[in-house]
């Protein structure tokens, strides 16, 4: 929760510095869902096998597994700038899911705002898992906003997703999950794409 408090504090402190006297930022909230795929995965693991041998494994793979994600978001928009906190449930790769806490910053490509030519974004934060080290999650991409009504918009997001995670490791000889007490390390760098849609109020 320390990471979440830090992100919320940054969000609260930044916008008063950006807005001028008499001008107000717009508060936004919504729900986002979609898919992502870790296409390029580099992993490194080490563990003690059931026979007592030290196994050190490194791999570099191209994959096509599709992961889902469901997120809630809150944020502020001021002219061409946007700051949002996003959290929910996200798959990083096959059989590995996290609770992400992400801070997204966006910049509209038109002076008229995000609805004219969309916006570009960059985001970063952490992915939380029970009894595992914290993962790092970051990304960048493009958002196209379609106004559905005066108070409701549909955002279509697409971009690059990069994460550094700590997946479960399976003993390639015993074909079973390596227990925590036998695991030395498990690191995975995942590079892929994310496509989502969001209803924003």
Predicted regions and their residues:
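A subset of solvent-exposed loop/turn segments in beta-rich extracellular surface proteins, enriched
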Residues: 43-58, 98-125, 164-178
């Amino acid at each position: 929760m320390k990471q979440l408090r830090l992100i919320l504090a940054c969000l609260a402190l930044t916008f008063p510095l950006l807005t001028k006297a008499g001008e107000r930022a717009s508060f936004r909230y919504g729900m986002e869902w979609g898919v992502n795929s870790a296409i390029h995965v580099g992993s490194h693991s080490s563990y003690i096998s059931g026979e007592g041998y030290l196994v050190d494994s490194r791999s570099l793979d191209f994959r096509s597994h599709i992961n889902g994600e469901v997120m809630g978001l809150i944020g502020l928009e001021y002219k061409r700038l946007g700051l949002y906190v996003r959290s929910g449930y996200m798959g990083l790769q096959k059989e590995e899911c996290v609770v992400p806490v992400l801070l997204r910053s966006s910049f509209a490509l038109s002076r008229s705002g995000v609805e004219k030519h969309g916006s570009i974004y960059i985001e970063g934060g952490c992915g939380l898992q029970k009894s595992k080290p914290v993962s790092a999650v970051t990304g960048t991409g493009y958002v196209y906003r379609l106004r559905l009504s005066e108070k409701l918009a549909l955002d279509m997001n697409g971009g690059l997703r990069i994460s550094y995670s700590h997946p479960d490791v399976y003993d390639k000889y015993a074909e079973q999950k390596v227990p925590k007490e036998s695991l030395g390390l498990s690191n995975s760098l995942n590079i892929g794409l994310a496509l989502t849609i969001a209803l924003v109020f």
